[in-house]
């Protein structure tokens, strides 16, 4: 059924509910915002290019704290560096509740390390952090895994020299294999059919979640969930991924050695066995399944998407790529493999990677939250369970911190002496208690993959760099890089 028809039906049904129930009552004192229409809320003020653009425009008119109505549902928007930091750092506990993403709700059901709330989340987070310590962040092993994967990518690119190709698939392979190594304890060949199927499902799902149709579903999910649409396609895709995860979990269970856990799944299974008599434990099969699903989806797509944007920017600004290569040649040379220790000696390359993350802005709104208790924030009383979005894009493009916020310029992260400078507006992984748990791995991947590729290859575009369009393929909860062609030429 056409989206416009479903939307009309949704409005009509909402009108009937409005007549029966009247206005929803909200105690507290929500911040003002654009005047909503009955039933429609602020829908007509939303840009089809994505809600993010609309929220930035509303920020200019209503300030950093305002309320937008998704249909009849009030949602508080927080914009600007200082506002977001105040909420997520100074009021961290109050803003730590995870909100619901309607298109994912049927499959996630508030389970998993990123979708549970309060105490349940803290328990699973501790396990995840411990597992990343043992199998990922802070260990030489994860750096070795990334370097080995980068080596495989360099070898694969030899098969494509001089040929224009879409790099999306290859970037998915390398980031997907790092997550697979940590979660499943194995990596896959780039031609493995099962691996390719999983990557295709994840990419299509990521694009669907970021689509305008998905944003419309967030507004009218109570009605649209009964009809065919983007939510059912997402469910179908993720159900197939879950079937694979379930099969892997059973294989892990059959070969589990309590004295030698191999990966995240093994570690979780050991906790399940330890707490099998606890009826209230968070270590149960479905939490394991959803945690692995989310790690696989977020860990693969967000980093590969950033790499796609990064190399598109190198095509558009070839002088930047040349300057990065000059620093690589000076610090690393052509023979030695890049290491994470090189970061401290390569301020320009680090500034370029930071600017890629800032400019590409792949997670413009982060994940929604719900207030855990009645909270006085900037003069407004936000009731418990108030839905809140943090417009991270407004910080990454904050003119108070970035002289040219809408221009790609690595100088944003360099001081007068050419050293890398910190910036509190830089929050691509969010901040506070709910910041991305995989930040350390993602930062390591971006540096090692980026430098290894440019150490071995120069890049060129089959089109004039001045004509390269940076408009995202989709822009919603996430921004999906546009499809493009790139040519890798051995140095």
UniProtKB/Swiss-Prot annotation:
Protein name: Cytochrome P450 2B3
Cysteine pairings via disulfide bonds: none
Gene Ontology BP annotations: epoxygenase P450 pathway; ketone metabolic process; response to Aroclor 1254; response to bacterium; steroid metabolic process; xenobiotic catabolic process; xenobiotic metabolic process
Catalytic activity, EC: 1.14.14.1
Family as reported in the entry's similarity comment: Belongs to the cytochrome P450 family.
SUPFAM superfamilies: Cytochrome P450 (SSF48264)
UniProt binding sites for heme: 436
Presence of keyword Oxidoreductase: yes
Cellular compartment(s): Endoplasmic reticulum membrane; Microsome membrane
Topological category with respect to the lipid bilayer: Peripheral membrane protein
Gene it is expressed from: Cyp2b3
Entry GO MF terms: anandamide 11,12 epoxidase activity; anandamide 14,15 epoxidase activity; anandamide 8,9 epoxidase activity; arachidonate epoxygenase activity; estrogen 2-hydroxylase activity; heme binding; iron ion binding; monooxygenase activity
Keyword terms, alphabetized: Endoplasmic reticulum, Heme, Iron, Membrane, Metal-binding, Microsome, Monooxygenase, Oxidoreductase
Main location: endoplasmic reticulum
Domain of life according to the entry: Eukaryota
Annotated catalysed reactions: an organic molecule + reduced [NADPH--hemoprotein reductase] + O2 = an alcohol + oxidized [NADPH--hemoprotein reductase] + H2O + H(+)
Tissues expressing this chain: Liver. Not found in the lung, kidney and prostate.
Induction of expression: Constitutively expressed.
Cofactor annotation: heme
Protein purpose: Cytochromes P450 are a group of heme-thiolate monooxygenases. In liver microsomes, this enzyme is involved in an NADPH-dependent electron transport pathway. It oxidizes a variety of structurally unrelated compounds, including steroids, fatty acids, and xenobiotics.
């Amino acid at each position: 059924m056409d989206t416009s028809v479903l939307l009309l039906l949704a409005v009509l049904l909402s009108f009937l509910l409005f007549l029966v129930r009247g206005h929803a009552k909200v105690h507290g004192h929500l911040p003002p915002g654009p005047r909503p229409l009955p039933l429609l809320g602020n829908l007509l003020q939303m840009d089809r290019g994505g809600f993010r653009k609309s929220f930035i425009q509303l920020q200019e008119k209503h300030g950093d704290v305002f309320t937008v109505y998704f249909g009849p549902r009030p949602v508080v928007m927080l914009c600007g560096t200082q506002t977001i930091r105040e909420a997520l750092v100074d009021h961290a506990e109050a803003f730590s509740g995870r909100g619901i993403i309607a298109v994912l709700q049927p499959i996630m059901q508030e389970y998993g390390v990123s979708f549970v709330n309060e105490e349940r989340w803290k328990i699973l987070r501790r396990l995840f952090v411990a597992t990343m310590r043992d199998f990922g962040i802070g260990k030489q092993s994860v750096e070795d895994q990334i370097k080995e994967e980068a080596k495989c990518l360099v070898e694969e690119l030899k098969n494509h020299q001089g040929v224009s190709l879409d790099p999306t698939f290859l970037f998915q392979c390398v980031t997907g294999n790092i997550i697979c190594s940590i979660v499943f304890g194995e990596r896959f060949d780039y031609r493995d059919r099962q691996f390719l199927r999983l990557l295709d499902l994840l990419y299509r799902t990521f694009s669907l979640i970021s689509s305008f149709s998905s944003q419309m579903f967030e507004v009218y999910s109570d009605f649209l969930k009964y009809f065919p649409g983007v939510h059912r396609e997402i469910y179908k895709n993720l159900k197939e991924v879950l079937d694979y995860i379930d099969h892997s979990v059973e294989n892990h269970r059959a070969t589990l050695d309590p004295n030698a856990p191999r990966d995240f799944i093994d570690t979780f299974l050991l906790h399940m066995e330890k707490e099998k008599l606890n009826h209230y434990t968070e270590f149960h099969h479905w939490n394991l399944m959803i945690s692995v699903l989310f790690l696989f989806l977020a860990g693969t797509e967000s980093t590969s998407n950033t790499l796609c944007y990064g190399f598109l920017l190198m095509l558009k600004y070839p002088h930047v790529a040349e300057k990065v290569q000059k620093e690589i040649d000076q610090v690393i040379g052509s023979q030695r493999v890049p290491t994470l220790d090189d970061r401290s000696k390569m301020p320009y390359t680090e500034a370029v990677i930071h600017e890629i993350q800032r400019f590409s802005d792949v997670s413009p709104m982060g994940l929604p939250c719900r207030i855990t208790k009645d909270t006085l924030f900037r003069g407004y009383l936000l009731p418990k369970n108030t839905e809140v979005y943090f417009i991270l894009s407004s910080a990454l493009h904050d003119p108070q911190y970035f002289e040219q916020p809408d221009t790609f310029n690595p100088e944003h992260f360099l001081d007068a002496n050419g050293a890398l400078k910190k910036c509190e507006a830089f929050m691509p992984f969010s901040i506070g208690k709910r910041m991305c748990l995989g930040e350390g791995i993602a930062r390591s991947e971006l540096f090692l993959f980026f430098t290894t590729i440019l150490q071995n290859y120069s890049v060129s575009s089959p089109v004039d760099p001045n004509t390269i369009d940076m408009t995202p393929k989709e822009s919603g909860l996430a921004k999906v890089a546009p499809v493009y062609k790139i040519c890798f030429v051995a140095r």
